[in-house]
Amino acid sequence: VDVLCLDKTGTITEGRMEVSDVISLDGNDHEKALCEMIYALGDNNPTALAVMDRYKKDGFLPEREWSAKTAIHFSSAKKWSLAAFEDKGTYILGAAEFILGDAMTDALREQIKTLSEGGYRVVLFAHSDNMPPEVEGGALPENITPVALVRITDCIRKEAPATLKYFAEQ
């Protein structure tokens, strides 16, 4: 075999996302806010499920306590989701370049690139003290601050290394 082309999702991976790290960018713990955001969204997308599974597995999963004023679900066009809470501000999760735009620093871009090595997907968890503007389809609030990076992996199937080794030897 000279060339082997694979669509990794579901072929060499299980198709099940798993959060490997939540890296604070400001020294604070953001697990409670991240879980409250996922509760408010009520999403069953792979990223949301991976976040909740991480905290269930760690025995941390907090009770839902915050009341969301607004929730905007993830879309592949926007590449982010958000939940706005009374007295807590707005939390946003998604692709850093779509959330921050021109405000994304070179240092953050480099950190995301480094964390992405090895096939990880890295999403930004950000906060704003402001509420999002009320426009159709949803929009981001002003003054967004990156607070954490969430590193996610798609688990490799147990038999994948042996399968790939077989093809390499052919």
Residue ranges: model-predicted function:
Residues D2-P146, I152, K158-Q170:
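Cytosolic catalytic regions of ATP/NTP-dependent phosphoryl-transfer enzymes
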